Curated annotation (Swiss-Prot):
Gene source species: Yersinia enterocolitica serotype O:8 / biotype 1B (strain NCTC 13174 / 8081)
Gene3D superfamilies listed in its UniProt record: 3.30.1440.10
Record's subunit section: Part of the 50S ribosomal subunit; part of the 5S rRNA/L5/L18/L25 subcomplex. Contacts the 5S rRNA and the P site tRNA. Forms a bridge to the 30S subunit in the 70S ribosome.
GO CC terms in record: ribonucleoprotein complex; ribosome
Protein name as it appears in the record: Large ribosomal subunit protein uL5
Keywords assigned by UniProt, alphabetized: Ribonucleoprotein, Ribosomal protein, RNA-binding, rRNA-binding, tRNA-binding
Function: This is one of the proteins that bind and probably mediate the attachment of the 5S RNA into the large ribosomal subunit, where it forms part of the central protuberance. In the 70S ribosome it contacts protein S13 of the 30S subunit (bridge B1b), connecting the 2 subunits; this bridge is implicated in subunit movement. Contacts the P site tRNA; the 5S rRNA and some of its associated proteins might help stabilize positioning of ribosome-bound tRNAs.
InterPro entries per record: Ribosomal_uL5, Ribosomal_uL5_bac-type, Ribosomal_uL5_C, Ribosomal_uL5_dom_sf, Ribosomal_uL5_N
């Protein structure tokens, strides 16, 4: 079992119950899923780029990514409906906790010129979204085998009812928010 999950059950639940005066343990917000998305717009010209992006995402997440397709045709971007233009992975359970632990302890500190994550990236319902400019911050990616530096979107979906609850949950995990 992931250390972060044990830490959540032992420490974070007690901390949040006292902070928000919950009556039941089930009211305490928890991390539901983590979604990783990599948009590869250049895949229109070269399909190999999408395969490489999917391989990178598989290495980062530990599971096979789902290829996303264009919902509608856009002439300005030269894409048609149904063209493969990206890939995404939804992590739940044990893999989610392991990824979150790696993200907080290893990947985020390796971001260049890092001054903390924005605390304003909550959506109003306690879910947090962030973008990473380089996939090479993850130790699973071999720097020498990278054909192109790509970014990815990371969305942490929680059961929190408000942004304050979601922020308190992630802050309890020692998420490096900007002061």
């Amino acid at each position: 079992m992931a250390k972060l999950h044990d830490y959540y059950k032992d420490e974070v639940v007690k901390q949040l119950m006292s902070q928000f005066d919950y009556n039941s343990v089930m009211q305490v917000p928890r991390v539901e899923k983590i979604t990783l998305n990599m948009g590869v717009g250049e895949a229109i010209a070269d399909k190999k780029l999408l395969d490489n992006a999917a391989a990178d995402l598989a290495a980062i997440s530990g599971q096979k990514p789902f290829i996303t397709k264009a919902r509608k045709s856009v002439a300005g971007f030269k894409i048609r409906q149904g063209y493969p233009i990206g890939c995404k992975v939804t992590l739940r359970g044990e893999r989610m906790w392991e990824f979150l632990e790696r993200l907080i302890t290893i990947a985020v500190p390796r971001i260049r010129d890092f001054r903390g994550l924005s605390a304003k990236s909550f959506d109003g319902r306690g879910n947090y979204s962030m973008g990473v400019r380089e996939q090479i911050i993850f130790p699973e990616i071999d720097y020498d085998k990278v054909d192109r530096v790509r970014g990815l979107d990371i969305t942490i979906t929680t059961t929190a009812k408000s942004d304050d609850e979601g922020r308190a949950l992630l802050a309890a995990f020692k998420f490096p928010f900007r002061k």
